[in-house]
Amino acid sequence: MDPYELVTRNTVEVVTDEELRALIDRPVRRVYTGYEPSGEIHLGHMVTVNKLMDLQQAGFEVTVLIADLHAFLNRKGTMEEIRETAEYNRRCFEGLGLRGANYVLGSDVQLTPEYELAVLELSQAITLNRAKRSMDEVGRQMDNPTVSQMVYPIMQMVDIATLGVDAAVGGIDQRKIHMLAREHLPSIGYPAPVCIHTPIINGLDGKKMSSSAGNVISVADSEEDIKKKMKKAFCPPEVENNPVLEILRYHVFPRAGAVAIRRPEKFGGDREFAAYEDLERAYAAGEIHPLDLKNAAAAHLIDILAPVHDYVCSR
């Protein structure tokens, strides 16, 4: 797979395609994603982790910002608690295969005079309404936001400038913040970043993924947990908004390269699929039972997540 195909597979959009193609031709190219420290790293996080691994393979230098100050502004705990979680998150990302990346703790770069001045400069240009809309898009609808929450998206923009990256990766819910960065960073002397957006996948029940809703698979889940959760997963006959197919498309195929459906001969015997599109067609045609699809997804996820358990526990 050529670098462009690697970078763009399983993405929703690239802003802009022309800029990305030009960037790929450069000898040095840098990309980043920021993660607010989370006590539970799950399949939602893994979508962008997978994309960063694609970018590494395509020759990009990858920076991962563990945004401890962002988490503090978003009331996720004390700084001590958040930093402990941040270290756990870093180990999880490395266990998932994202090694050789430059891991940066937000507070190590976000408390300098230069950073703060850039935040203040951008705050003069961005209205409260636009800042609030960008936060609403990432799932933080706020009827009565604090000033700190309005600073959040501006800091995210300055992160791009401070880290010296050429491109930013995020879920499609980050689009409004990224578009603000493209619009305003040139006004303070920084280039507009290429923006690579990945899909937001559904929770196991077909609804919005949320740790609090219990509809996620975490990297810390045991084999039994994964099997139980997959067995209960929503798996309609349709391919649209099917969380089991999404797991296979965005997690299993990029890592395993192929998927095996194991079943007794009386139910059609084993089948191998080298491409997601072939599996989707077979499922849509009724050639694969939902339970067989769930079992295949569970087996592959167990294989994918096993190294995470080993890596995190060994440190």
Swiss-Prot record:
EC annotation from Swiss-Prot or TrEMBL: 6.1.1.1
Cited Gene3D superfamilies: HUPs (3.40.50.620), Tyrosyl-Transfer RNA Synthetase (1.10.240.10)
Subcellular location field: Cytoplasm
CDD domains: TyrRS_core
Binding site for ATP: 211
Domain of life: Archaea
InterPro entries, alphabetized: aa-tRNA-synth_I_CS (IPR001412), aa-tRNA-synth_Ic (IPR002305), Rossmann-like_a/b/a_fold (IPR014729), Tyr-tRNA-ligase (IPR002307), Tyr-tRNA-ligase_3 (IPR023684), Tyr-tRNA-ligase_arc/euk-type (IPR023617), Tyr-tRNA_synthase (IPR050489)
Binding site for L-tyrosine: 32, 152, 156, 159, 174
Major site of localization recorded for this protein: cytoplasm
Biological process annotations from GO: tyrosyl-tRNA aminoacylation
Pfam families per UniProt: tRNA-synt_1b
One MF annotation (Gene Ontology) recorded for this entry: ATP binding
EC class: ligase
One cellular component (GO) term of this entry: cytoplasm
Keyword annotations from UniProtKB, A to Z: Aminoacyl-tRNA synthetase, ATP-binding, Cytoplasm, Ligase, Nucleotide-binding, Protein biosynthesis
Role according to the record: Catalyzes the attachment of tyrosine to tRNA(Tyr) in a two-step reaction: tyrosine is first activated by ATP to form Tyr-AMP and then transferred to the acceptor end of tRNA(Tyr).
NCBIfam families referenced in this protein's UniProt entry, alphabetically: PRK08560.1, tyrS
UniProt cross-references to HAMAP family, sorted A to Z: Tyr_tRNA_synth_type3 (MF_02008)
Assembly: Homodimer.
Protein name: Tyrosine--tRNA ligase
Organism, as annotated: Methanoculleus marisnigri (strain ATCC 35101 / DSM 1498 / JR1)
Taxonomic path: Archaea, Methanobacteriati, Methanobacteriota, Stenosarchaea group, Methanomicrobia
Gene this chain is encoded by: tyrS
